[in-house]
A protein has these predicted regions:
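Conserved pre-motif I regulatory segment
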Residues: 1-24
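Walker A/P-loop
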Residues: 20-39
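Conserved Walker A/P-loop ATP-binding site and its immediately adjacent core
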Residues: 34-39, 44-65, 132-137, 273-275
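Conserved P-loop NTPase motor "coupling/switch" region that bridges the ATPase
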Residues: 92, 109-199
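Conserved helicase/translocase motor-coupling segment
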Residues: 202-290
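Conserved helicase ATPase core of P-loop NTP-dependent helicases/translocases
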Residues: 286, 290-323
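Conserved SF2 helicase motif VI
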Residues: 347-365
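Conserved segment of the helicase C-terminal RecA-like domain
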Residues: 359-379
Length: 379
């Protein structure tokens, strides 16, 4: 028997009252979207469901569904987008990590939109709150939930948004919403949306680390390890991060490695935006006697699951990874109180998802015991 939070019970009630059996779970990261989605399907008397979700979460979906007597078939977002993949018009559908289908011009969302017009079965859309931060994303949700209300994207903009004409585009620039402070508030107030605000309070400890690069790098963009000039500012910035963190042998520079070790406290999650830095961190910690597992975009679903299980079971000290850690990693909050953002991302939504991996669950979660260290690489 599952112990349910109030927001999960409210979502089920919204599902029951939905005239078209469609709902969006607009929850913060780590709020039990998997179980809640399936509970909505159970409320609609659905026992055979297609789940569109990241491959690393497929086993979790199936195990959770079993406890409710529901059979699920799982597919990835990539497979869903394939033109030859056909979908049933009579089978209930759960779309997890909805934002991974892209915006209104993306092939994934357009396929879902076309299916939803003819689907005679319930739909649950689910994704974490940080990912709904613009008009495009909100339109994509509204079009699926209320196809009769929402027309085209331009009509949506003119009816709901503050706009500025763009001389270089047929689509005007959105500067705000007419009746709401932002896109998030618009979605939270939408009919058939179950909303749980992202109001967990936590502190981020900023850790500064300095490394002196050669003057030729700053002056000319000389990449000394490949003996050529950086082709762009983007390449130069990537090189700056890599050169400042990784030595020529493929390990973290010793001062940085020592600084990372100082912030390890019990089972620790370590995020790196670059896979090369994640690999270097694993090598460096191994020399210090730490047991670790690595999860990157190259890690297969089976290996990722095995590594996550090893970390959850306490077999290893640190879980190191890239953006792959943002999805399919439920349950880390129960075993891990420390997150080290060694190599930060520019994506605020992704960072919030990663932080959410170690935050406790529930409506009024106390995150005072959680430690989040964000490294600032200066060079």
């Amino acid at each position: 028997m599952h112990k349910l939070f109030e927001h999960q019970l409210e979502a089920v009630e919204i599902a029951k009252q939905s005239s078209n059996q469609r709902i969006c779970l607009y929850y913060r990261t780590g709020s039990g979207k998997t179980l809640t989605s399936l509970l909505c399907m159970q409320a609609w008397n659905q026992d055979d469901v297609l789940v569109l979700a990241p491959p690393s979460t497929h086993n979790h979906w199936k195990k959770t569904a079993e406890t409710l007597g529901i059979t699920v078939d799982t597919i990835s977002h990539a497979k869903f987008r394939m033109s030859h993949y056909k979908l049933s018009k009579t089978k209930a559908l759960i779309v997890d990590e909805m934002h991974l289908l892209g915006g209104y011009k993306a092939a994934g969302w357009m396929k879902l939109n076309l299916l939803s017009r003819h689907l005679s079965a319930p739909i649950v859309l689910a994704s974490a709150t940080p990912n709904y931060n613009d008009a495009d994303r909100v339109y994509c949700i509204e079009k699926i939930l209320h196809p009769a209300k929402s027309k085209g994207y331009l009509s949506f903009l003119y009816e709901n948004c503050k706009l500025e004409m763009n001389p270089f585009s047929q689509t005007p620039d959105v500067t705000g919403f007419l009746e709401y402070p932002d896109a998030a508030a618009y979605l939270a107030d939408m009919r058939n949306v179950a909303y749980l605000p992202d109001n967990v309070e936590y502190e981020i400890d900023e850790v500064s680390y300095s490394f002196e690069l050669e003057p030729a790098f700053h002056n000319y963009g000389l990449l000394s390890r490949t003996n050529r000039l950086a082709a762009s500012q983007i390449e130069k910035e990537h090189a700056r991060i890599i050169y400042s963190t990784i030595d020529r042998a493929g390990y973290l520079h010793k001062p940085l490695s020592d600084l990372v070790e100082q912030h390890i406290n019990g089972p620790t999650l370590i995020f790196c935006n670059h896979s090369s830095i994640a690999e270097a961190a694993q090598r460096s910690l191994a020399t210090k006697g730490y047991t670790t597992v690595l999860v990157t975009g190259k890690t297969t679903a089976a290996v990722k699951q095995r590594n996550l299980d090893a970390f959850r079971d306490g077999d290893v000290k640190a879980l190191i990874g890239t953006a792959s850690l943002a999805t399919g990693t439920d349950g880390l909050d129960k075993v891990c109180d420390t997150l080290i953002i060694l190599d930060d991302t520019q994506d605020d939504s992704l960072r919030r998802q990663l932080i959410g991996r170690i935050l406790p669950r529930g409506e009024d979660s106390d995150a005072s015991q959680k430690q989040i260290h964000r490294f600032n690489i200066l060079s």
